[in-house]
Amino acid sequence: MHKLFILTGPTASGKSEVSKIVAERLGCTIINCDSKQIYQHVPTITDQAEYLRTSPQFRLYGYVHPSNSYSVGLWLEDAKREILLAWEKKSPTIVVGGSGLYISSLIYGLSEIPPADAHIRQKARALLSEVGNDTFFELLLRRDANVCKIDRRNSNQLLRAFEVFESTGVSIFSWRERCPKKRPFENCEVCVLFPPKEELHPKINSRLVDMINSSAVAEVEYLMSLNLPADAPIMKAIGVREVIEYLRGNISLPEAVEAAQRNTRQYAKRQYTWLRRQLPQDAQFLPTREEMVQHLVSRLTETEK
């Protein structure tokens, strides 16, 4: 039976660099599991190094146009296809990224909930944009008391709950009970690059400075030219929001950098918590890139024997 390796960890921990070294040593296939690195035309703001976008060993990087509607369900289907193709070629395979919802879907599966019609999705987005998260949350709560389980700051979850109820008349939580999740792959091994926070923060800060000094501002100008809705996933990416505020004249460029650094550190803090609580008990946590490279090379070599 094939074993699927998943490499995750907080933002800026060095997952991509580890995957590059392992791919070069073993010739394995790397499949993206970062919900922002799927997008085309914005490599700097999403930290897509050139090798991620150009090497045939690296899959599902920079392949979705920012204006396209995309979801975790679509990503899971794309990822399953790429994994099975790699296994057909007898290529060792690692799924790499830090997006919790994507990782969870790959490990635990998704409930089979009917998709919403396009006009309902548009209605949900328009309402959220008009009234804001708090009022939108309260409107949902009147329909379904279980909505209290949703973080009102999470626009994607609020929108999905609205869409499901509007489309089917049934709560998304009821659908999840009716349609239990089915694991896409039974044999997964999760490896977590987990550096100490005090080591991660300087890397986050320097990475944001490098992004701004490169082409991040031009990329955000391009996104703004597309007239995407404010709640489009790429428009909510850390770095994008702050640069938009700068381009609109609301803050200075140094203030935008500071805000992006602060928001990225807060995001990393949430990732640390999620990684400790939501992964399988046998997930392997390692603090350094060197240890993770050694571990993955060893485990992949053993598995291929």
UniProtKB/Swiss-Prot annotation:
Its EC number is 2.5.1.75. This is tRNA dimethylallyltransferase. InterPro entries: Dimethylallyltransferase (IPR039657), IPT (IPR018022), P-loop_NTPase (IPR027417). It is an enzyme of class 2 (transferase). GO terms for molecular function: ATP binding; tRNA dimethylallyltransferase activity. Substrate binds at residues 11-16. Disulfide bonds: none annotated. The gene is miaA. Transmembrane segments: none annotated. Its cofactor is Mg(2+). Monomer. Catalyzes the transfer of a dimethylallyl group onto the adenine at position 37 in tRNAs that read codons beginning with uridine, leading to the formation of N6-(dimethylallyl)adenosine (i(6)A). It comes from the Bacteria. Belongs to the IPP transferase family. Pfam families: IPPT. The record marks 99, 121 as: Interaction with substrate tRNA. One of its GO terms (biological process) is tRNA modification. It catalyses: adenosine(37) in tRNA + dimethylallyl diphosphate = N(6)-dimethylallyladenosine(37) in tRNA + diphosphate. Residues 34-37 are annotated as: Interaction with substrate tRNA. Keywords: ATP-binding, Magnesium, Nucleotide-binding, Transferase, tRNA processing. Gene3D superfamilies: 1.10.20.140, P-loop containing nucleotide triphosphate hydrolases (3.40.50.300). ATP binds at residues 9-16.
